[in-house]
Amino acid sequence: VPGRDGADLIVGRVRADALGPLRPSGATAPIRPSGTPQINHWNGSTWSTSALPSGPCSVFEADCALTGVSGDSASDVIAVGEGTIPTSTGWVTEALAYRWNGTAWSQLTVPGSVTYDELEHVQAFSPTDAWAVGVDSSAATGAAVATALNWNGSAWSQVATPVSTSNDLSINAISGTSASDIWVVGQTVTPGYHNRQFTSVIMHYNGSSWAQLTAPDNSGLLDVDAVSPTDAWAIAADGSVLRWNGTAWTVVTTLAQGNTAIAALSATDVWVAGVVSLTHYNGTSWTSQPDPAGVNALTGHAVLSPGDLWFSGYYYPSNAVTAPAVLHTSSG
């Protein structure tokens, strides 16, 4: 849900048979056939829905979703995701990327496989430097590779990463303090329903290449947020909170399972959120916060400035539907 200059963006999809994830309260949009991407914008007082250009996701029965968005200004925003598109020879899954120039969205050409390619998250540092990450899977080899794409202002280029596995691979979050200090987290999972083995994935970009680091927790990493080159935070599936000190990652505490988002405003102001859970760290101790009224889960976050924090999630207005929820604090 990242945005800048007080403008927040939420991305998701609209389904004909559901409300779709992350449609904020107060925003209205028609429910269209198939799974078509949707982008909502907060201008400081109201929500509105931005139109995307027609393309492969406009094809009947196409199922598309946008899962990451980031902007370095109100006139330079990139959104990424994936679409499953019907073709004459079958279904293909391809990565999606769109750019907002302050007036309209345009679709960007994404390099990579046409067999199975998806982008999950993006972070923009300037109009000529943004990174998108995801997974590229090959049906021929059975390998899943962590994908990293760099935007130079006019085109994407693929940058090699050290993560390749025959197991299932998920890339769950990206966060960086600069173009030479970027973190990506996720996990690999052995196939099957029983006795599955998880392995946490941590990658770091130093401005010239990606490196894989050892994680002290192997339940899978769900989110990461960097404060400085010597201070970054991550949340694991088993509730462990990890911290980077400039040299190594360590587990600093273990909270309840079900936490999926971590927001670090500073070294003394860290929030962890999840399913009916909100916990705050003040630099000394962790304190459980009152559950936001009516919200069942918080799953994403954006820090616009010190003390200006947004969470996105969902709630259940009835047993039949799931509705989006947005939580905002301007006090830190």
Model features per residue range: what roles?
Residues 1-332:
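Residue-level hotspots at or immediately adjacent to binding/recognition sites across diverse folds
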